């Protein structure tokens, strides 16, 4: 098995952190950027390792962009965090796996290593001229992302509408997508349990396994 995956359990999401200490707030206002675009929907997470459940988050982000006003788009942003028990895969390996697992979203998966937190992404969206922003997060992260993002609106970025929506709740006792988790995949690698690890990964439209799953394991 991939030695990197033979590590820890779930932890805090570094994506849901505020700006670096010392970032001015009261005296800082966002750059004055013409709002020429609609809504940017952002799916931000560790994706470490990526699994079938993440496809649901990406589909929701894509659907949100389609249903929004003209000039809207979506982006999937993997965090840069790596090297800890909960983040065993390096950034490049993670992005490559995500693009291979979800080819229909490949063009929307960011390779920018400067996006360390959701705040970085929202500042980018503001500077790109988006009038609104929407964050897609797992059920238990929604409140955390919403409170953090709202805290810095009008200070580090400026959106007329800023909201966080859920990609769904994970049911550890359930089956299918709702039961998928990166923790399960990491534990399967730790236990050298290839079958369970494989079951967490998506298949293509013909039901074929992800081509890179043996290398990822």
PLM ranges: what are they?
Residues 1-26:
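Extended, compositionally simple fibrous regions characteristic of intermediate-filament-like scaffolds
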Residues 18-217:
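Nucleotidyltransferase catalytic core that binds NTPs
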């Amino acid at each position: 098995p991939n030695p990197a995956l033979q590590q820890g359990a779930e932890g805090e999401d570094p994506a849901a952190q505020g700006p670096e200490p010392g970032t001015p707030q009261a005296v800082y206002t966002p750059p004055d950027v013409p709002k020429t675009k609609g809504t940017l929907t952002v799916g931000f997470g560790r994706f470490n390792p990526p699994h079938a459940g993440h496809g649901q988050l990406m589909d929701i982000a894509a659907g949100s962009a389609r249903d929004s006003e003209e000039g809207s788009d979506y982006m999937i942003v993997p965090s840069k965090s790596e090297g800890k028990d909960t983040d065993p895969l390096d950034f490049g390996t993670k992005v490559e796996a995500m693009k291979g697992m979800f080819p229909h979203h490949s063009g929307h998966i960011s390779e920018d290593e400067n996006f360390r937190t959701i705040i970085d992404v929202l500042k980018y969206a503001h500077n790109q001229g988006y009038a609104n922003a929407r964050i897609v997060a797992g059920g238990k992260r929604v409140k955390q992302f919403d409170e953090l993002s709202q805290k810095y609106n009008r200070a580090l970025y400026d959106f007329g509408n800023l909201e966080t929506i859920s990609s769904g709740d994970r049911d550890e006792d359930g089956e299918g997508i709702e039961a998928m988790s990166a923790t399960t995949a990491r534990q399967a690698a730790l236990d050298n349990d290839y079958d369970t690890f494989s079951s967490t990964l998506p298949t293509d439209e013909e039901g074929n396994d992800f081509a890179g799953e043996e290398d990822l394991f």
